[in-house]
């Protein structure tokens, strides 16, 4: 009977050791489960957040057809937007008159391909669509319209030598279209826009080509009028008070102020004034809307003096 207590004590120690060991294992399993649960919850939150808040690139290609009238003719422009490659392709004309304009916002280049010329012209462009802020000052429509030059006229002159190394267009859509034709760099050149001639004097009107294709083929014709304008500009430096005018108000003719306010003619002007504004083509392209295709079109009109219209009706001009 005296040997039983030691044996019982050894059995108790063994049981206590096994219990402590099992408790440690359970505690470790609980800690591992908690860590894995936190990691799984974090991954779920990150996946959900990236799906809902991260801008997903659309794999869809957008096509659009735009119809407009130019010089009385109905024309169409086909636009294709590929968000994956960040390119825009504009197609206009048919046959030899077809023109393709590719805007590569990923690499920062623009390619213009003329099917009739079998040539491709490359120029650099921005890689990010600019954000246009609203104008700070509002234009009062009732104010008198003065001579306004909206912007300096720019022509794109091609380089004399073609592009030999085309590695910079390796991953561009431009190279797919212009791979088998000659490619040239084109650079902007400013043209000094002349002041309008006094319509009381004799003068010739200057006609500039309206299409980019004609401007490329007729670069010399674009430069000649600029030289002529600079030579004759010194003859128009007289002030408004020194210009001759046929004032028919002395004969009892009164002009309605609404003619001036609505832009039909200018009552107090002594020369024709040009008013220009930019019109954007609503092609539903990238933001901001409307999308300005080729920077928009500049539409100008000339506001003549009211006395000039009277003189014209009397046959004096």
UniProtKB/Swiss-Prot annotation:
Domain of life: Eukaryota
Glycosylation sites: 94, 180
Main location: membrane
GO CC list: membrane; nuclear envelope
Membrane topology: Single-pass type II membrane protein
Annotated keywords: Disulfide bond, Glycoprotein, Membrane, Nucleus, Phosphoprotein, Signal-anchor, Transmembrane, Transmembrane helix
BRICHOS domain sequence ranges: 93-186
Disulfide bonds: 120-178
Entry function: May be an angiogenesis inhibitor.
Protein name per Swiss-Prot or TrEMBL: Tenomodulin
Organism for this UniProt entry: Mus musculus
Gene responsible for this protein: Tnmd
